[in-house]
Amino acid sequence: MIQEQTYLKVADNSGGKIVKCIKVLNGTNKKYANIGEIIKVVVKTANFKSKIKKSQVLKAMIIRSKTGIKRLDGTIIKFNDNSVILLNNNEQIISTRVFGIILRELKNEKFAKLISLSNEII
């Protein structure tokens, strides 16, 4: 579960390295976000020559979480880090590559491109 003030790693090649959650979207008084949900983040560290700059406010989708996710067959999948991919204001993926493992639960109509950008799907 990701809440406000949580630091997250960026798992794509957009240029950001570390981001901080400033708002959990999709609810008026929602406190936590899980895998697959969209949050508002601010960039804390970024690569030197990239489109993403420090202190830039963007949207992001959570792709990995330490708390994990429970599947319908009863298995629980947890990760070692909290990771996101950065989105623009129209909620489209900025990057051209995604690093690390992606869950197949993230495949939906809106983010079908996400599965093709990653090389490892569980």
UniProtKB/Swiss-Prot annotation:
SUPFAM superfamilies assigned to the protein according to its UniProt record, in alphabetical order: Ribosomal protein L14
Q: Which residues form a coiled coil?
A: none
Molecular function via GO: large ribosomal subunit rRNA binding; structural constituent of ribosome
Short name of one Pfam family = Ribosomal_L14
> Some GO term, biological process aspect, for this entry: which one?
translation
Query: Would you name any one GO CC term?
Result: cytosolic large ribosomal subunit
Print the keywords alphabetically: Ribonucleoprotein, Ribosomal protein, RNA-binding, rRNA-binding
**UniProt-listed CDD domains:** Ribosomal_uL14
Q: Which family is this protein grouped under? A: Belongs to the universal ribosomal protein uL14 family.
Assembly notes? Part of the 50S ribosomal subunit. Forms a cluster with proteins L3 and L19. In the 70S ribosome, L14 and L19 interact and together make contacts with the 16S rRNA in bridges B5 and B8.
Q: What does this protein do?
A: Binds to 23S rRNA. Forms part of two intersubunit bridges in the 70S ribosome.
- Write down what this protein is called: Large ribosomal subunit protein uL14
Source organism phylogeny: Bacteria, Pseudomonadati, Pseudomonadota, Gammaproteobacteria, Oceanospirillales
Q: Which gene encodes it?
A: rplN
